[in-house]
Amino acid sequence: FNPLGRIDQYIRSARKQAELGEITWQQADSIQKEIYQEYQSYYNPDSTQNSSFANSWKSFSKSQLNELIDLKIPVYIAYGSNDINSDFCDLLPLYFIEKGKSNYQVIRYPNLEHNFFPIEKNGYPDYQNGRWYVVMNSFVNWSMKN
């Protein structure tokens, strides 16, 4: 989950690749610039790229942070630490605190990817040892109390 929207993951990915030395900072700048230009085209009503694809990206890339904070119901967010989409989840409690939101639970599952599979040393998910049952049991237990 990334409350800042899906496009954020691509910006962060280029940055992380540069930080790790996988690409140069100039390459990261170029990648990010292309992402910005493509994203800008989605908001141009005269663009030929303005299609259902663009509409999909606009909806998935819209920040949901304010909506999330404004929810009156309890909020439970679980995420795998190895999911680039989840980087911002570490900061969510700060935003909740600023707005006085206290009915939330944010849980990081270390060394798991987006679908809660462990990551092997080769960097690939271990699909034989998924942790969905752990995540769901934790959520069910939390929801019974909230």
Question: Whereabouts are the PLM-identified features?
Answer:
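Catalytic metal-binding/acid-base residues of hydrolase active sites
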Residues: 4, 82-83, 113
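Second-shell loop/turn segments in exported
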Residues: 52-58, 76-82, 124-128
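Short beta-strand/loop motif that positions the catalytic acidic residue
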Residues: 71, 77-79, 109
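Conserved, well-ordered alpha-helix/loop/beta-strand core segments that scaffold catalytic motifs
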Residues: 74, 92-94
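Catalytic active-site module of serine/aspartate enzymes centered on a nucleophile-bearing elbow/loop
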Residues: 105, 110-146
